[in-house]
């Protein structure tokens, strides 16, 4: 399955909620009708969505939020299921501790896609070592930084400025002047923002 490169607003409309694929700080709610499906007049249907359909829709939504494809998502779920504790929460923690997501949460990228690009273009270091794998798992205490050559990029400066205004997650500590941040700890479920019902995904894979 190829990565989707079409209009981001269409994906949010399909899920009926803002997935913040265009910006973490600017909602699409004022720009388009999120409760209307994509299409010239919005697709309508009188049929009730089945439990399976609802569960599948939730999985698709989470995949789109984090920019993860099906095979990789299945691996994340398998790992989450192997770990102790709540499988759904474990899944979200694995997704949140991806390097591209941490770069995004620290405000270095305005979207996860932009953060993923920064990692792929070798603009990021982890504990002083250049990293270029977006799916790399970040551990507590790891220091994420922007490489010197990338610190003057306008998009990074703007994204960081907006992130500072909106506030950072409690599980990261960012020094904007140094363009670096520390992954303090794995986020708790209450710390993970977003309209996500992970229990539906667990139910889907438990069928």
Swiss-Prot record:
It comes from the Bacteria. InterPro entries: Ribosomal_uS4, Ribosomal_uS4_bac-type, Ribosomal_uS4_CS, Ribosomal_uS4_N, S4_RNA-bd, S4_RNA-bd_sf. GO terms for molecular function: rRNA binding; structural constituent of ribosome. Residues 97-160 form the S4 RNA-binding domain. GO terms for cellular component: small ribosomal subunit. Disulfide bonds: none annotated. Belongs to the universal ribosomal protein uS4 family. This is Small ribosomal subunit protein uS4.
